[in-house]
């Protein structure tokens, strides 16, 4: 499973990249606004930190303007992945861009039918929002399983990018289903490293080592 971080905070991105475990970054208009920086500048800075796909989302709602915005965004760096909403105009834009060799991440997916359409439009990634799905009493992981089955049935090249990840269990369940990618806020990724028994074990080892009076260095 590929690990993306969902943030526009370059300090957090650099921290995650330093682990060697980060494969890409997702951003959205809300995260860009929170950064307080210029959109193009933020994406350019992120692309210098992470060589993998960096999702930059168009904000237009019509196909023609989406294409114009995508042209600006994909000139920033070779690893920019254009992010479009799952609408008719978004999928028209996805098809045009993917036919031209541009990576496209189709976002705001809430049904397997929508994911099927994105696969037919040639999306590099489909982003189903599991947390928001769960929020309204639906089964987010069930959605991921349905998309996995459909994509396997028809051998789509589109990767399932699990989004709206709220906690480590979302990541675990997505991995068990066979999702290709997950994107999560920095805090959720950090939580993956933690376990009380690991902490307890380290404390025990350190206490015993201190008693020996030795040093490796």
Swiss-Prot record:
Gene Ontology MF: a single term: transaldolase activity
Pfam families membership: TAL_FSA
Gene coding for it: tal
General function of this protein: Transaldolase is important for the balance of metabolites in the pentose-phosphate pathway.
Organism expressing this protein natively: Rhizorhabdus wittichii (strain DSM 6014 / CCUG 31198 / JCM 15750 / NBRC 105917 / EY 4224 / RW1)
Keywords, ordered alphabetically: Cytoplasm, Pentose shunt, Schiff base, Transferase
Database matches in SUPFAM superfamilies: Aldolase (SSF51569)
NCBIfam families listed in its UniProt record: fsa_talC_mipB
Gene3D superfamilies associated with the record: Aldolase class I
InterPro entries documented for this protein: Aldolase_TIM, TAL/FSA, Transaldolase_3B, Transaldolase_3B/F6P_aldolase, Transaldolase_AS, TSA/FSA_arc/bac
EC numbers for this chain: 2.2.1.2
Enzyme active site: 83 (schiff-base intermediate with substrate)
Protein name in the entry: Probable transaldolase
Coiled coil (UniProt feature): none
């Amino acid at each position: 499973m590929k690990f993306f971080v969902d943030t526009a905070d370059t300090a957090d991105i650099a921290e995650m990249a330093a682990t060697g475990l980060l494969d890409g970054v997702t951003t959205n208009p809300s995260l860009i606004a929170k950064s307080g920086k210029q959109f193009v500048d933020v994406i350019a800075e992120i692309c210098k930190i992470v060589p993998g796909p960096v999702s930059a989302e168009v904000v237009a709602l019509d196909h023609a303007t989406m294409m114009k915005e995508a042209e600006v965004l994909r000139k920033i760096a070779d690893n920019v992945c254009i992010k479009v909403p799952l609408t008719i105009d978004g999928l028209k834009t996805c098809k045009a861009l993917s036919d031209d060799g541009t990576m496209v991440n189709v976002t705001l997916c809430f049904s397997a039918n929508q994911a099927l359409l994105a696969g037919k439009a040639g999306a590099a990634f489909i982003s189903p929002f599991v947390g928001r799905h769960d929020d309204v009493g639906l089964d987010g992981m069930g959605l991921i399983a349905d998309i996995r089955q459909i994509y396997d049935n028809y051998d789509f090249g589109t990767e399932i990018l699990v989004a709206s990840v709220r906690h480590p269990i979302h990541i675990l369940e997505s991995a068990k289903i066979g999702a290709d990618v997950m994107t999560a806020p920095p805090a959720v990724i950090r939580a993956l490293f933690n376990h009380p028994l690991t902490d307890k074990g380290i404390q025990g080892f350190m206490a015993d080592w201190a008693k020996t009076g030795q040093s490796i260095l």
